[in-house]
Amino acid sequence: MEVVDPNLDPWKHPGSQPETPCNKCYCKKCCFHCQLCFTRKGLGISYGRKKRRQRRRTPQSGEVHQDPVSKQPLSQTRGDPKGPEESKKKVESKTKTDPSD
């Protein structure tokens, strides 16, 4: 074992840090570059704060790409356009006229 200068801080000891800086590459060689690279790249563990994704906001300028709601066509109502009351009356009249029981 090499003799280490006791006046040096532990993180400055020779061999404590790799000669090359860490990079963003995820190849096998770079994953085993140092302990920090191994935990981040090899194991995928990161203890940093997660950044929140910002929602897209509409531009504040007068240029809007959508038509206003008033110009859009009204959606078609499904089913009976007359309404539920008249359809109930039809059902009641059919049950009274059909004595199939």
Curated annotation (Swiss-Prot):
One annotated GO molecular function: cyclin binding
Biased composition (Basic residues): 48-58
Gene Ontology terms: cellular component: extracellular region; host cell cytoplasm; host cell nucleolus
UniProt short sequence motif Nuclear localization signal, RNA-binding (TAR), and protein transduction, positions renumbered to this chain: 49-57
First-listed, main subcellular location of the protein, grouped into a coarse class: host cell
GO terms, biological process: DNA-templated transcription; positive regulation of transcription elongation by RNA polymerase II; positive regulation of viral transcription; symbiont-mediated perturbation of host chromatin organization; symbiont-mediated suppression of host innate immune response; symbiont-mediated suppression of host translation initiation; symbiont-mediated suppression of host type I interferon-mediated signaling pathway
Placement of sequence motif Cell attachment site: 78-80
Region spans: Transactivation: 1-48
Modification after translation (UniProt): Asymmetrical arginine methylation by host PRMT6 seems to diminish the transactivation capacity of Tat and affects the interaction with host CCNT1. Acetylation by EP300, CREBBP, GCN5L2/GCN5 and PCAF regulates the transactivation activity of Tat. EP300-mediated acetylation of Lys-50 promotes dissociation of Tat from the TAR RNA through the competitive binding to PCAF's bromodomain. In addition, the non-acetylated Tat's N-terminus can also interact with PCAF. PCAF-mediated acetylation of Lys-28 enhances Tat's binding to CCNT1. Lys-50 is deacetylated by SIRT1.
Region (Disordered): 1-20, 47-101
Keyword Phosphoprotein in annotation: yes
Asymmetric dimethylarginine modifications at: R52, R53
A Pfam family matched in the record: Tat
Annotated site location: Essential for Tat translocation through the endosomal membrane: W11
Region (Interaction with human CREBBP): 1-24
Compartments reported by the entry: Host nucleus, Host nucleolus; Host cytoplasm; Secreted
Annotated binding of Zn(2+) 1, by residue: C22, H33, C34, C37
Residue ranges, annotated region (Core): 38-48
Record's subunit section: Interacts with host CCNT1. Associates with the P-TEFb complex composed at least of Tat, P-TEFb (CDK9 and CCNT1), TAR RNA, RNA Pol II. Recruits the HATs CREBBP, TAF1/TFIID, EP300, PCAF and GCN5L2. Interacts with host KAT5/Tip60; this interaction targets the latter to degradation. Interacts with the host deacetylase SIRT1. Interacts with host capping enzyme RNGTT; this interaction stimulates RNGTT. Binds to host KDR, and to the host integrins ITGAV/ITGB3 and ITGA5/ITGB1. Interacts with host KPNB1/importin beta-1 without previous binding to KPNA1/importin alpha-1. Interacts with EIF2AK2.
Miscellaneous comment as given in the Swiss-Prot or TrEMBL entry: HIV-1 lineages are divided in three main groups, M (for Major), O (for Outlier), and N (for New, or Non-M, Non-O). The vast majority of strains found worldwide belong to the group M. Group O seems to be endemic to and largely confined to Cameroon and neighboring countries in West Central Africa, where these viruses represent a small minority of HIV-1 strains. The group N is represented by a limited number of isolates from Cameroonian persons. The group M is further subdivided in 9 clades or subtypes (A to D, F to H, J and K).
Name of the molecule in the record: Protein Tat
